[in-house]
Design a protein with these regions (language model features):
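Short, basic/aromatic beta-hairpin or loop at an interaction surface
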Residues: 46-61
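Short alpha-helix capping/helix-loop boundary micro-motifs
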Residues: 63-70
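Short, compositionally biased
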Residues: 87-110
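Glycine- and charge-enriched low-complexity intrinsically disordered segments
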Residues: 106-125
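Extended boundary segments
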Residues: 1-50, 121-123
């Protein structure tokens, strides 16, 4: 990972997403990314039961723990860095959960327009 502080969708320093459960491509609590992150784990989502059930149904089980990968399994209300491509699909299929834009990496905007993200934002004033 680059030592450089990554930016959020507003061009500001990226804020931490979650330390419990510990999230992020680097398991550093932030939705940081690099060229090796093919899933682009950059959207800080507050997962809902609906989103988790949809995700499991379409092939990405985020509920079942996998301790061998440092994955605790998620429950309603957890914050987690989800894949931008996966979140874009959730929007299109009506299963998107809420997101924290100040905790969402600017890289997300390469895949999801800011206007779509704002519809699900928890942290707009």
């Amino acid at each position: 990972m680059s030592e450089k502080i990554q930016k959020n969708v507003f061009g500001e320093p990226l804020e931490p997403c979650s330390s419990d459960p510990l999230t992020g491509w680097f398991r550093d609590g932030c939705c940081n990314t690099d060229k090796n992150d093919q899933g682009v784990h950059t959207v800080c989502a507050k997962v809902s039961d609906e989103f988790l059930q949809w995700s499991k149904k379409v092939g990405n089980d985020l509920i079942t723990p996998h301790p061998e990968f440092g994955f605790p399994g998620l429950k309603d209300g957890d914050s987690w860095c989800v894949c931008a491509t996966w979140y874009a699909r959730a929007i299109e299929e009506g299963a998107a959960c809420q997101v924290y834009l100040k905790r969402t990496n600017v890289k997300t905007l390469e895949l999801i327009p800011i206007e779509k993200l704002k519809k699900f934002a928890l942290d707009l004033s």
